[in-house]
Design a protein with these regions (language model features):
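Residue-level hotspots at or immediately adjacent to binding/recognition sites across diverse folds
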Residues: 1-141
Length: 141
């Protein structure tokens, strides 16, 4: 694993970053987008995407400084009409189904322009692995 993040993450100094990883890449024209996570020491994984090497944090509704088992991981990224769309997994320890941290359930998540939408809060375990977006505004799809 390589540290590619050289910026402040989750409000903490850049030397607080332990590692970062990209799980998906999307090229739109000459712009490169990557989705992934940055591991911050004593906080956990912060969901992010990079646009031409500039890091953007994705929304998470939990406080990683207080939540040992929470995570949000984007698995794929796409762009349509300048809207950045990422999908992945979301896990909040306050949503435990029992007293064992390992028995909680991942929920499918969607981020549109950094804003989080949980796709299936009422169903069991779910996950979003890939996103395909088509612009059909000027033609019939």
């Amino acid at each position: 694993m390589t540290k590619v993040t050289k910026t402040k993450t989750y409000g903490l100094a850049k030397n607080s970053v332990w590692s970062s990883r990209a799980s998906s890449i999307h090229v739109e024209g000459g712009t490169v987008y990557m989705a992934g996570a940055v591991n911050v020491i004593n906080a956990g994984d912060v969901p992010v995407y990079w646009k031409n090497k500039v890091q953007h944090e994705l929304e998470a509704e939990f406080d990683l400084k207080k939540c040992d088992y929470c995570k949000a991981t984007p698995n794929d990224i796409s762009v349509v009409k300048n809207d950045v769309i990422a999908v992945g997994d979301y896990y909040d320890e306050s949503d435990f189904v029992d007293n064992y941290y390992t028995n909680g359930e991942n929920k499918a998540a969607l981020w549109v322009n950094k804003k989080l939408f949980k796709l299936c809060e009422c169903c069991g375990s779910s996950s979003a692995k890939s996103v395909v977006v088509m612009d059909c505004s000027n033609k019939s799809c």
